[in-house]
Amino acid sequence: MFKELDPILHSQLRLAVISLLISVKEAEFTFIKEKTNATAGNLSVQLNKLKEAGYIEINKQFKDNYPLTSCKITTTGINAFEQYVKDLQAYLHIVQKLLYRML
């Protein structure tokens, strides 16, 4: 009845990151950290999980002798996000049907 949700995106922080990246061309680590209220360590771990899944690309470079990490969503990430949204909508549709039957 219920389809399994993408375990990579079914994490609050990873879903927040993908939601941010889908609306921008690219985002710096500090911007993502600020918008998600994540700690640097936790965010770094979650970004690596998204990267390993092929959902984002991470670019590390130096700007004025300071490290600069930026991220952008991949086509795979966009497709995964769109499917995740569809799957959640399907969940809600099933729940609505079940609730309607109970009335």
Predicted stretch roles:
Residues 63-85:
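Basic, amphipathic "hinge/linker" alpha-helix immediately C-terminal to the N-terminal HTH DNA-binding motif
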Residues 31, 38-40, 66, 78-81, ...:
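Short, surface-exposed linear patches
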Residues 54:
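Glycine-centered, phosphate/nucleic-acid-interacting loop/turn motifs that mediate DNA/RNA or nucleotide
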Residues 2-42, 61, 68-72:
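N-terminal helix-turn-helix DNA-binding core of bacterial DNA-binding proteins
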Residues 1-2, 79-103:
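Amphipathic alpha-helical dimerization/coiled-coil segments
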Residues 58:
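Short beta-strand "wing" residues that participate in macromolecule-binding interfaces
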Residues 46:
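Residues within the DNA-recognition helix of helix-turn-helix
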